[in-house]
Amino acid sequence: MKGKNYKITSLYSFFPFQENLIFDLKNKLLEIENENDLSGLLIFASEGINGTICAEKNVIDIVINLIKEYTDSRNLNIKVNFSKKKVFKKLKIKIKKEIVTMGVPEINPSENNGTYIDSAGWNKLIKNQNTIVIDTRNHYEISVGTFQNSINPNTRNFSEFPKWVDDHLNTHLENKDSTNIAMFCTGGIRCEKATSLLKKKGYKNIYHLKGGILQYLDDIPKKENLFEGECYVFDKRVALDQELEKGSYSICHACGMPISIQDQKRKEYRKGIQCHFCIDQFSDNDRKRFEERQKQIDRLKVENNKINKD
């Protein structure tokens, strides 16, 4: 942690969150932001809270203690990481129907979900020949890294997951009543909600990785690690390597897809303008706009470097 001034905290909790308390917490957090260098994204809904915040350690501690006053702290899932730089520009607080959008209102993860499996037990579970492993993240996240032999539902967003379950899950099960279903995601929230969906549909033996990939990478030594590649994250770092340091991926600012060092060497790649994923998605006029935007970004970087040197 030496030299790393920013504490990055991912958190979520499923619990009944009353509307008046939602706005009360939001206002208190905005007051903290006004007086401190607090950034991140928080989502509030009647089903709970979800998000990631970034600030100096003492500020994060204040925020977490405040959030615990509104939640059942026993069910508040927290994952901590550190960075030399801010990973968000500012604090955004959004109030939505769901803290992670699935679009199935009849499920209730705070009352009915699968069995948590901690990092120590995960390897044994997924090596079991009677277990199928499902990555509940989006296809572009999975392209950056995933667990060995896991199933990719190839979804563009989490709201497509229920349809994948209806259309495809049974084709992966030899026996619906006896096969273990192990699910995982970045920090635990999507796979937890996915287990609630499957239980509602009558599936049995449903498990999810407690704390998600990030907790697993923090807990498991590299020589025992079954995760392959890097872990996509929704901030400026883009992806984290297996030591939870900033990885090798960047973002195509035209389409938002994660791109590797190898991707940037492809002939289709033009920084800030296009990559091989989106070369056919945009018009020439779009690319001209992207080119002007990239020129402005480059000019600002040069100017900022001059200011910092002075």
Curated annotation (Swiss-Prot):
UniProt key word Ribosomal protein: no
GO terms assigned for molecular function: oxidoreductase activity, acting on paired donors, with incorporation or reduction of molecular oxygen
Any single GO BP term: tRNA modification
Residues at the active site: 185
Pfam families hit by this protein: Rhodanese, UPF0176_N
Enzyme class: oxidoreductase
InterPro entries per the UniProt record, alphabetical: Rhodanese-like_dom, Rhodanese-like_dom_sf, TrhO, TRHO_N
Record flagged with keyword Oxidoreductase: yes
Keywords recorded for this protein, A-Z: Oxidoreductase, tRNA processing
Catalytic activity: uridine(34) in tRNA + AH2 + O2 = 5-hydroxyuridine(34) in tRNA + A + H2O
Source species, domain of life: Bacteria
The protein's Enzyme Commission number: 1.14.-.-
Domain Rhodanese: 127-225
Entry similarity comment: Belongs to the TrhO family.
Role: Catalyzes oxygen-dependent 5-hydroxyuridine (ho5U) modification at position 34 in tRNAs.
Protein name stated in the entry: tRNA uridine(34) hydroxylase
Organism: Prochlorococcus marinus (strain AS9601)
Gene name of the encoded protein: trhO
